[in-house]
């Protein structure tokens, strides 16, 4: 009880503090009333000028704290003139809590939308953008349209971000002082912004301040399902199949060389020639053919370096990796970089991962990137621990403007569901006779339809509220408080819209809320109850339960059933027991605790990918924002060469074999014959590095000389393409690792620690692959001097999807490609033979 009393005392203390500041705001009412409309706009301009002169975000916040009373008083006056509504003191208190970066818990009907206008206005003065976030696009559209009138009167601009808007329209919406959007669309825009190739293609500004309406729904209920942008799969899958067919046709030594020591396999001139004919391409080494080369190399590796029943097994149509140390299969683990798919193609089983995740993020990680985050809802106190631990937000319960008159009756418990529903229908019929409006809350859509059929049989006209239809939803909710109205709704439907009582309804008891089942979360039950008794209206609520309800079955209703049977109670007789209600609440707390633990676990795993995502996105943004990436390219070339020297050259070896190192250098940096054994024979690793480095520099300068001013554009294109290719592969690999990692707990291992360690190793490997690919394409791409390198348009963003919502889905756009440069007849042949193209692979032309 000590902990609970501390929370209660803390809320009391906070409410007192908010009340004091709110009184200060209210005391300025007369000062604002004498200002003309023009003077109000000028006051905004003055605030903007003063706050925007401060560059430091923390100091800006301090300044906003200082002007809060004046700013809030100004908004109150604006609301009075525009809407003929003046925010109450409790609304001002809620607005102060939101500005602080906390959650204002305000009961239904207390005017959360108007409450949000004050902190939105105040924080928008900083000129960094404020995002007002709703659960669906309908609410975003309605609120932005209604509130724009007030903000524009005060001198601020408002934007609306919808899924249907074009890139330019989105950019314009985000450029406004205040932007209304759904959580889904914000997350997708963030991911898409980190997939562009040019700075001017971004739509968002840096994330500054967000106010989330129905914050518990977005940050708690939707926290576990990630936002995903995925690419099309057909092309990728068919390429694995084609590469597999091609690999089967090749002959060892003639078409490819295999080094058993390093397990490296690469095409010979003859092999490259065959590939060009098979895939109907002119030059295998053109930049645009990177995907083809990658698939061929992977297919070769699958056929030549990996053996069935040694490196992997095929069990029930699935390729399972064999642990080289234990000899056991590793379910859930997959080879990375497309190798697993290549093996699946080789073995003729279904090629997995038809859609490739190009980018993903959870709401937990997206919203934690804002400088300041706040929210409002009718129900958040039960989840306060989660808000505090994960988002560093406190929940402040704001007092109601008028005392709550709703009568929350105790639960009625029946033996069977039939008995329960019969009783619900009788209750509705009785209330309907008196004209009292009834709102029936159900947990599932099927239950809504079942009750709807029962009411139809009794001749009761009613509406069924479907959360999928937002426009119809508002209309139904608007009528739900009228005399004689009966509305059936799933518990989550209708959020964000108030039920206002019709004429004469107050006198007959107000809105009656009937819950047909307890939800596993107390919060959802509280939301349903909160539909009644808004702004001091009369009303009542009651839950009807049965021992067959899912929650009761899960948490032991057998004992209760035996007791009811002993008492000889039949299906039509309920028990009304505080003990049972307490047991139900205890079961709900257990479920909430389990769900919190699951979300916390997901966050711990996601933290690994979050850090990696941050590094990759920063790297991409640096490349995009930089005019010249030559320093980065230089560092990658040196790093790749240094790794090659370290791996292949051992100074302790008295009789070193330089062939693997020379093959490596030829494969990544130089043409065949450029590095001779006598140039490095007998030298130590440092000298060998310098010998090769001087040759690399010459090749680099030669490439630069060919395209001159366009080198920066060429390097940017190669860097971004290499990063994106390997990053999307890495996301897939990490996902596969995560799916199978829980099995480690059976072997007394710590799955999270293993995931962190292996994830770190995979990331390092990916970074090395990016560097090696970049080195190879910068030095080995055949550049035609007289043809411009085109700016590469942004890659296809694929399909945006969020498991629990339809808002964010976007149709895949056609993918633009960069034209490859043809090989000049006198240029060195790209196959690495050292011959001129016309005397080698150019003979056929």
UniProtKB/Swiss-Prot annotation:
Listed cofactors: Zn(2+)
Basic residues biased stretches: 835-845
Ligand binding (Zn(2+)): 829, 831, 840-841
Pfam families associated with the record: P-loop_SecA, SEC-C, SecA_DEAD, SecA_PP_bind, SecA_SW
InterPro entries named in the record: Helicase_ATP-bd, Helicase_C-like, P-loop_NTPase, SEC_C_motif, SecA, SecA_CS, SecA_DEAD, SecA_motor_DEAD
Molecular functions (GO terms): ATP binding; metal ion binding; protein-exporting ATPase activity
Record's cofactor remark: May bind 1 zinc ion per subunit.
Binding site for ATP: 91, 109-113, 498
Protein localization: Cell membrane; Cytoplasm
Cross-referenced SUPFAM superfamilies: Helical scaffold and wing domains of SecA (SSF81886), P-loop containing nucleoside triphosphate hydrolases (SSF52540), Pre-protein crosslinking domain of SecA (SSF81767)
Disordered as annotated region, ranges: 795-845
Domain of life: Bacteria
Catalysed reactions, as listed in the record: ATP + H2O + cellular proteinSide 1 = ADP + phosphate + cellular proteinSide 2
Any single GO CC term annotated in Swiss-Prot or TrEMBL for this entry: cell envelope Sec protein transport complex
Main location: membrane
UniProt entry keywords in alphabetical sequence: ATP-binding, Cell membrane, Cytoplasm, Membrane, Metal-binding, Nucleotide-binding, Protein transport, Translocase, Translocation, Transport, Zinc
Assigned EC number: 7.4.2.8
GO biological process: intracellular protein transmembrane transport; protein import; protein targeting; protein transport by the Sec complex
First and last residue of the signal peptide: none
Membrane topology reported for the UniProt record: Peripheral membrane protein
Subunit structure and binding partners: Monomer and homodimer. Part of the essential Sec protein translocation apparatus which comprises SecA, SecYEG and auxiliary proteins SecDF. Other proteins may also be involved.
Similarity-based family: Belongs to the SecA family.
Entry-linked HAMAP family: SecA
NCBIfam families in UniProt: PRK09200.1, secA
Job of this protein: Part of the Sec protein translocase complex. Interacts with the SecYEG preprotein conducting channel. Has a central role in coupling the hydrolysis of ATP to the transfer of proteins into and across the cell membrane, serving as an ATP-driven molecular motor driving the stepwise translocation of polypeptide chains across the membrane.
The protein's name in its UniProt record: Protein translocase subunit SecA 1
Native source organism of the sequence: Staphylococcus haemolyticus (strain JCSC1435)
């Amino acid at each position: 009880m000590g902990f609970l009393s501390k929370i209660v005392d803390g809320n009391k203390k906070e409410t007192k503090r908010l009340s004091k500041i709110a009184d200060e705001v209210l005391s300025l009412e007369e000062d604002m009333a004498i200002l003309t409309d023009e003077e109000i706009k000028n006051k905004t301009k003055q605030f903007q000028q003063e706050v925007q002169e401060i560059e430091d975000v923390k100091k800006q916040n301090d300044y906003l704290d200082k002007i809060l009373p004046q700013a809030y008083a100004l908004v109150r006056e604006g609301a009075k003139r525009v809407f003929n509504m003046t925010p109450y003191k409790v609304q001002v208190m809620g607005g102060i809590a939101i500005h602080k970066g906390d959650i204002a818990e305000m009961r239904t009907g207390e005017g959360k939308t108007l409450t949000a206008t004050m902190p939105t206005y105040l924080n928008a003065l900083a000129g960094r953008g404020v995002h007002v976030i709703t659960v669906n696009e309908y609410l975003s559209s309605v609120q932005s349209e209604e509130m724009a009138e007030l903000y524009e009167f005060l001198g601020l601009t408002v934007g609306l971000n919808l899924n249907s808007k074009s890139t330019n329209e989105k950019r314009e919406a985000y450029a406004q002082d205040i932007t209304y959007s759904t959580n889904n669309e914000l997350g997708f825009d963030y991911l898409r912004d980190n997939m562009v190739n040019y700075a001017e293609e971004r739509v968002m500004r840096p994330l500054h301040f967000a106010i989330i309406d129905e914050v518990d729904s977005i940050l708690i209920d939707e926290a576990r399902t990630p936002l995903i942008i995925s690419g099309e799969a057909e092309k990728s899958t068919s390429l694995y199949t084609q590469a597999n067919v091609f690999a089967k046709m090749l002959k060892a030594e003639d078409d490819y060389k295999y080094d058993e020591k390093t397990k490296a396999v690469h095409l010979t001139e003859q092999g490259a020639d065959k590939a060009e004919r098979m895939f109907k391409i002119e030059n295998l080494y053109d930049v645009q053919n990177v995907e083809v080369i990658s698939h061929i190399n992977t297919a070769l590796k699958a056929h030549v370096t990996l053996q069935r029943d040694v490196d992997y097994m095929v069990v029930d149509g699935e390729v399972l990796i064999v642990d080289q140390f234990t000899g056991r299969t590793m379910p859930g683990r997959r080879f990375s970089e497309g190798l697993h798919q290549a093996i699946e193609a080789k073995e003729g089983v279904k090629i997995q991962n038809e859609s490739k995740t190009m980018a993903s993020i959870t709401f937990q990680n997206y919203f934690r990137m804002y400088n300041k985050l706040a929210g409002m809802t009718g129900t958040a106190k039960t989840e306060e621990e989660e808000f505090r631990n994960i988002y560093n937000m406190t929940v402040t319960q704001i007092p109601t403007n008028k005392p709550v008159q709703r009568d929350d009756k105790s639960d009625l418990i029946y033996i069977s569901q039939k008995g329960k529903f019969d009783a619900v229908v009788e209750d509705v019929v009785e209330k309907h006779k008196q004209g009292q409006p009834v709102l029936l809350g159900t947990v599932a859509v099927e239950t809504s339809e079942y009750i709807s059929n029962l009411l139809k049989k009794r001749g009761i006209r009613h509406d069924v509220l479907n959360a999928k239809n937002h426009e119809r939803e508002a209309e139904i909710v608007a009528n739900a408080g009228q005399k004689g109205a009966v509305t059936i709704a799933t518990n989550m439907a209708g959020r964000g819209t108030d039920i206002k009582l019709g004429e004469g309804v107050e006198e007959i008891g107000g809105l009656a809320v009937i819950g047909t089942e307890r939800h596993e979360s107390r919060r959802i039950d509280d939301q349903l109850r909160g539909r009644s008794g808004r702004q001091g209206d009369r009303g009542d609520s009651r839950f009807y339960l049965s021992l067959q309800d899912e929650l009761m079955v899960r948490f032991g209703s057998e004992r209760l059933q035996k007791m009811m049977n002993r008492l000889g109670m039949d299906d039509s007789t309920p028990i009304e027991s505080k003990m049972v209600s307490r047991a139900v609440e205890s079961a709900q707390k257990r479920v909430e605790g389990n769900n919190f633990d699951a979300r916390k676990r997901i966050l711990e795993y996601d933290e690994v990918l979050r850090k990696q995502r941050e590094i990759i996105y920063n790297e991409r943004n640096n490349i995009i924002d930089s005019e010249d990436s030559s320093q980065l390219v230089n560092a990658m070339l040196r790093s790749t060469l240094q790794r090659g020297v370290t791996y292949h050259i051992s100074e302790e070896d008295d009789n070193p074999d330089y062939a693997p190192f020379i093959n490596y250098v030829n494969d990544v940096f130089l043409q065949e014959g450029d590095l001779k054994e006598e140039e490095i024979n007998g030298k130590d690793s440092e000298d060998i590095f310098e010998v090769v480095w001087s040759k690399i520099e010459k090749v680099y300068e030669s490439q630069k000389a060919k395209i001159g001013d366009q080198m920066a554009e060429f390097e940017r294109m190669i860097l971004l393409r290499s990063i994106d290719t390997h990053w999307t592969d890495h996301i897939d690999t990490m996902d596969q690792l995560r799916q199978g990692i829980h099995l480690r707990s059976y072997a007394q291992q710590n799955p999270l620690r293993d995931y962190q360690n292996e994830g770190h190793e995979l990331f390092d490997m990916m970074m090395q692959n990016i560097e090696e690919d970049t080195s190879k394409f910068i030095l080995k791409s055949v550049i035609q001097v007289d043809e411009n390198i085109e700016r590469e348009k942004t890659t296809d963003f694929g399909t945006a999807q969020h498991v629990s919502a339809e808002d964010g889905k976007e149709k895949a756009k056609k993918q633009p490609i960069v034209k490859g440069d043809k090989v000049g007849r006198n240029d060195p042949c790209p196959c690495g033979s050292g011959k001129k193209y016309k005397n080698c692979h150019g003979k056929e032309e």
